[in-house]
């Protein structure tokens, strides 16, 4: 494909993060939600530097571009990233200052160490002595030969100690802010009807004279700094070590990964900045980014809600109508398929299904894939209870789920101690598909049932992620799920099991080929002047071969509607592509579902999937796209996607210029798809 025919993946991702920033800028969004979006933006950007920028740096270091699916030279991509990130940083600061003004209108004040009254000063000093002092160990930078490795999840106060009469030479010190052990936000004693909040680092700033009292200085200044490190885990080819040992080694090495970004308060003492850059071995190529006074904004996702007079609680999830007044979820699933739509439907149904299986005397085994689990997972509880009740339980645990590796290693130990058979994935491929297979024997007859999901089996993320979960006892679907588990148990000996799947599209075995065939069928229909359409709901679209096929379909006249939240590399604005409509929706819930609908000559084919249309998902992961057979569920998915395509409040047009222009309501009824979807599903449940 000509490189001019797609948008650069990393630049497209930055455009997505700009949409998150738009939500923070939107004054119709509740104030606490606006702060949450600033936190999400910050967290997203941290991960982007840890992963994508780090990867580009690696490629430059080894002079590699070939076969890495890049649209242009990595050095040029990095230059464009730097330019856009600096633009976003300025917009971030503007929005933050606007939010601070709005907070003041609500009598909420984020105060620093210089704005405290006497009562607050005493409170802060006492709080420091009682809660913080024992967690603070300052480092005198000139006194240490080997500079410490700065954690990329921490923030640090870089301090300048000086004497007003200049009788003592100034010194530099470093204080780690213990925000992972202590609350970042501290509510201060305040006047009636006012709320004053101070940040943990500002409490430490206030107490710098006490921390450094024995050095004889009387003037102290400080600035927040932060580093971001390469988060890639290198898994070597040493056959003498297990995958677990390699991951454990990789996690240790990650803490010392190469610095890919250094962010600092732009008001920092110039000599201190120069000293830090030198001691850290940085250069201007290492993304030195000036920022504001506050860093690690991701903590603002959890800004205390109690300070707001007006609360904006999320709508509570509700029970699927088919499960109302039902004593056992299992009985209904054995009769018909049920589609759970999170976060609107309650995730408790999934937990109930596993709990029922754990105590059902007819159930003999449970198999499940686990990618990211909740911190206090009820799924794990159900699985361990099943073992206690004599069931054979198998959990496929993906140890390489990025940033969840340590948690999954801990889950592995807990599950194995309980007697669960743990499979730690497939060599060289992540298991990203989400399945559960429950086997019961009734009157010597084997019955298989379970679920296929677009998202993680995680009760925490199910409250804020938009996903679909198909509960089913369909024999064809469950036969394929069984085949996939057979493969996962012995991947090197059973590769034929993936290829044997008859209803589920599985990557890397056949998904690419099958998707190409489905698109080609629409192309053939369009060329024959027949109705032809494709509707896609994805997180990301960057696979060049699939994009090329979509271009071919668009040229042939296939109507293509796309809802893509994140990366979108397809160019849509072309006179020959009149039938292409692409939007991105960013709102209160994270749109995480993947759905594909092909007209198929009037016999529509509808799939829910764990896979985005990216090379990594199609060729290098275990992924699954599951067909939806029942007409009422097909219609429900079509209705939900149509509601989203009609969104004119939170939808942005995905255009060639990455402008993120909102869809124009044009005096029609205002449609906010997440609210409309809630109403649509809730009405069904009444």
Range-by-range predicted roles:
Residues 544-547, 551:
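Glycine/threonine-rich ATP-lid/beta-loop region of ATP-binding domains
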Residues 559-563:
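Hydrophobic alpha/beta core scaffold segments
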Residues 1-534, 552, 556, 568-686:
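N-terminal localization/anchoring segments of enzymes in phospholipid and broader phosphate metabolism
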């Amino acid at each position: 494909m000509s490189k001019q025919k797609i948008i650069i993946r990393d630049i497209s991702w930055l455009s997505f993060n700009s949409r998150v920033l738009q939500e923070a800028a939107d004054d119709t969004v509740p104030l606490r939600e606006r702060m949450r979006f600033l936190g999400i933006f910050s967290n997203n950007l941290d991960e982007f530097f840890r992963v994508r920028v780090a990867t580009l740096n690696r490629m430059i270091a080894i002079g590699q571009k070939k076969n890495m699916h890049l649209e242009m030279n990595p050095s040029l991509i990095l230059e464009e990233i730097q330019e856009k990130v600096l633009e976003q940083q300025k917009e971030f600061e503007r929005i933050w200052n606007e939010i601070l003004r709005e907070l003041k209108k609500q009598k909420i004040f984020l105060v620093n160490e210089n704005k405290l009254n006497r009562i607050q000063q005493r409170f802060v000093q006492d709080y420091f002595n009682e809660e913080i002092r024992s967690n603070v160990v300052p480092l005198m930078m000139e006194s240490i030969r080997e500079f410490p490795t700065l954690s990329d999840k921490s923030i640090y106060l870089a301090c300048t100690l000086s004497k007003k009469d200049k009788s003592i030479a100034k010194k530099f010190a470093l204080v780690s802010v213990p925000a992972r052990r202590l609350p970042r936000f501290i509510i201060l004693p305040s006047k009636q009807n006012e709320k004053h909040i101070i940040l943990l680092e500002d409490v430490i700033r206030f107490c710098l004279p006490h921390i450094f009292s024995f050095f004889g200085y009387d003037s102290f200044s400080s600035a927040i700094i932060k580093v971001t490190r390469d988060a890639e885990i290198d898994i070597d080819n040493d056959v003498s070590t297990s995958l677990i040992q390699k991951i454990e080694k990789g996690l240790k090495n990650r803490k010392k990964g190469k610095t890919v970004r250094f962010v600092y308060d732009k008001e920092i003492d110039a000599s201190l900045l120069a000293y830090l850059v030198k001691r850290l071995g940085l250069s201007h190529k290492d993304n030195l980014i000036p920022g504001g006074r506050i860093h690690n904004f991701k903590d603002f996702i959890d800004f205390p809600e109690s300070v707001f007079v007006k609360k904006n609680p999320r709508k509570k999830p509700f029970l699927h109508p088919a499960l109302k007044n039902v004593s056992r979820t299992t009985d209904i699933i054995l009769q018909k398929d049920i589609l759970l739509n999170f976060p609107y439907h309650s995730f408790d149904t999934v937990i109930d299904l596993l709990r029922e299986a754990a105590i059902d005397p007819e159930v003999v085994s449970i198999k499940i894939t686990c990618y990211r689990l909740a911190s206090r997972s009820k799924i794990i509880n159900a699985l361990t209870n099943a073992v206690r009740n004599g069931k054979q339980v198998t959990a496929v645990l993906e140890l390489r789920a990025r940033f969840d590796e340590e948690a999954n290693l801990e889950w592995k130990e807990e599950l194995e101690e309980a007697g669960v058979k743990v499979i730690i994935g497939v060599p060289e491929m992540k298991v990203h598909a989400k399945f559960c297979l429950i086997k019961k024997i009734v009157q010597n007859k084997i019955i298989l049932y379970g679920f296929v999901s677009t998202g993680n089996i995680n009760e925490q993320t199910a409250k804020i992620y938009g996903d679909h979960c198909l509960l089913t006892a369909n024999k064809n679907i469950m036969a394929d799920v069984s085949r996939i588990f057979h493969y996962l148990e012995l991947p090197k000996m059973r590769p034929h099991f993936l290829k044997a799947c008859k209803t589920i599209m599985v990557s890397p075995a056949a998904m690419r080929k099958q998707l190409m065939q489905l698109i080609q069928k629409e192309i053939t229909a369009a060329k024959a002047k027949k109705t032809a359409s494709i509707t896609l709901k994805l997180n990301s679209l960057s696979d060049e071969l699939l994009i090329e096929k979509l271009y071919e379909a668009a040229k042939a006249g296939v109507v293509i509607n796309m809802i893509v939240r994140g990366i979108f590399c397809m160019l849509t604005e072309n006179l020959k592509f009149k039938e292409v409509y692409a939007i991105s929706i960013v709102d209160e819930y994270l749109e995480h579902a993947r759905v594909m609908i092909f007209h198929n000559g009037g016999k529509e084919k509808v799939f829910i999937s764990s896979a985005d249309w990216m090379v990594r998902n199609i060729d290098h992961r275990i992924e699954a796209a599951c067909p939806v057979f029942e007409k009422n569920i097909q219609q429900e998915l079509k209705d939900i996607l149509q509601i989203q395509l009609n969104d004119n409040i939170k939808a942005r047009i995905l255009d060639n210029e990455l402008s993120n222009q909102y869809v124009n309501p044009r005096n029609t009824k205002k449609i906010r798809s997440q609210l409309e979807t809630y109403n649509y599903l809730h009405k069904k449940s009444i």
